[in-house]
Amino acid sequence: MNLNLLKYYIKENHDTVSTLALALDIHYITLTLKLNGKREFNKHEIEIISKRYNFDAALTMKIFF
């Protein structure tokens, strides 16, 4: 998992942990734990993030797997 690359895309898209957490319908602390590698993203969250930032399949794989 390449969390630094995901953090880059969050900033590049002028998003914050709070706004992304709202889009994922999770608490911002839960998202922070996921961004720090303490918890894993589930399939639904990966789909939402990939659509939100227009990731292609290769980039999704690079970031999350």
Regions found by a protein language model. Name each.
Residues 19-22, 49:
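Short alpha-helical "recognition helix" segments of helix-turn-helix
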Residues 17, 28, 46:
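Helix-turn-helix DNA-binding elements, focusing on the entry/boundary residues of the two helices
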Residues 26-41:
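Recognition helix of helix-turn-helix/homeodomain-like DNA-binding domains
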Residues 44-59:
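DNA major-groove recognition helix of helix-turn-helix/homeodomain DNA-binding modules
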Residues 14, 40-43:
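Residue at a beta-strand N-cap/secondary-structure junction
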Residues 60-65:
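Short amphipathic recognition helices of helix-turn-helix/homeodomain-type DNA-binding modules
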Residues 1-15:
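A short, Lys/Arg-rich alpha-helix, primarily the initiator
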